[in-house]
Every structure is written in structure tokens, then in C-alpha cells.
Design a protein with these regions (language model features):
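Nudix hydrolase/Nudix homology domain
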Residues: 25, 29, 101-145
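The catalytic Nudix box helix
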Residues: 34-69
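Active-site-adjacent beta-strand/loop module that shapes the phosphate/pyrophosphate-binding cleft
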Residues: 2-3, 70-97, 109, 113, ...
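N-terminal first-folded block
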Residues: 17-19, 23-35
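Conserved N-terminal beta-strand and adjoining loop/helix that marks the start
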Residues: 1-17, 35
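A structure-centric signal for secondary-structure junctions around beta-strands
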Residues: 2-4, 12, 28-29, 84, ...
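Short secondary-structure boundary/capping segments
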Residues: 7, 23-25, 77-80, 99-101
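Short, charged/polar surface micro-motifs in flexible loops or helix N-caps
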Residues: 10-15, 23, 40, 74, ...
Length: 145
């Protein structure tokens, strides 16, 4: 099974997303998505997200900034192996936001949830952002009334 991580990065009421590269070895080229990547063998998912954010945005995170909130299992004809993706929320500081340097992907965008809904997005990354926004940040009930 292939493991990966994704970061729902937020600052105030805005989310930091990326436009994915058009490189041929990238899944979902040219779509929007969250920052993240593969988990190395023997690596814990929380360490992986901190490493990936350092590699992609050149910022250092405190270990406690990464808060696990969702795991999505993916079994698709488009992938040779089943996949699992772990999502972490990352509330960033103004200093971290201002010091970011994009190292991977085409571009980064700090936008609100309404604009995110209008973009062509990696399907499970969009699900993770929407779930986080409505059921964790806004604390809507998941249970039936």
C-alpha cells in the first residue's frame, strides 16, 4: 500500500493551496491541491508532512502545528497499488506565511473556501478541505439530529 500525506494549511479564514505541476510524473497535473507528498518507508505520517512542507515551501513547522484529522483510503483503477492519504491541518503564523518560498508546483494561492469550490481540484484534497472547513473549524455536527 502506498502512503501519502496532505496539509490543509490555513491562515485566518484563508487556505493555502497549490496549482500542481504539469510534469509527466505527477498525478493530477495542472489541478489544484494541498501541499504534501509520499511517506517514506519507516517514516511516520506526521514527520512526513513536516518534511514535505519544508521541501515544498521552505518553512519550518513546530511538531505540534501538524494536527491529524482525516485518513482517506483510495482504491482506483488509475493506481497500481491501493493508497491511503493522511491529512493534517496546519495553522500557520504571519511570519511563516511571509517567509514561504515555493519550491515545488506551479504556484501557490491563499484563498477562501468559496473560491476553492470553483477550481479544478484533486478530488480527495477537495474533500479534505471541505470536511475540515465545515466540520472541524465551524464545528458543524456530523451526526444526524
Amino acid at each position: 500500500m502506498k502512503k501519502s500525506v496532505g496539509a490543509v494549511i490555513f491562515y485566518k479564514n484563508l487556505y493555502l493551496i497549490q496549482k500542481r505541476s504539469l510534469k509527466k510524473n505527477i498525478y493530477f497535473p495542472g489541478l489544484y491541491g494541498v501541499f504534501g507528498g509520499n511517506v517514506n518507508k519507516l517514516e511516520k505520517s506526521k514527520r512526513a508532512i513536516i518534511r514535505e512542507i519544508k521541501e515544498e515551501l521552505d518553512i519550518n513547522l513546530n511538531y505540534d502545528q501538524a494536527q491529524y484529522f482525516l485518513k482517506i483510503s483510495i482504491n482506483s483503477k488509475h493506481f497500481k497499488k491501493n493508497r491511503v492519504r493522511f491529512y493534517y491541518s496546519l495553522k500557520i503564523t504571519k511570519e511563516q506565511l511571509n517567509s514561504m518560498i515555493l519550491k515545488e508546483g506551479e504556484s501557490l494561492h491563499l484563498i477562501n473556501i468559496q473560491k476553492i469550490k470553483k477550481l479544478e481540484f484533486v478530488p480527495w484534497d477537495l474533500s479534505a478541505i471541505l470536511y475540515f472547513n465545515y466540520f472541524i473549524r465551524k464545528k458543524r455536527s456530523v451526526k444526524p439530529q
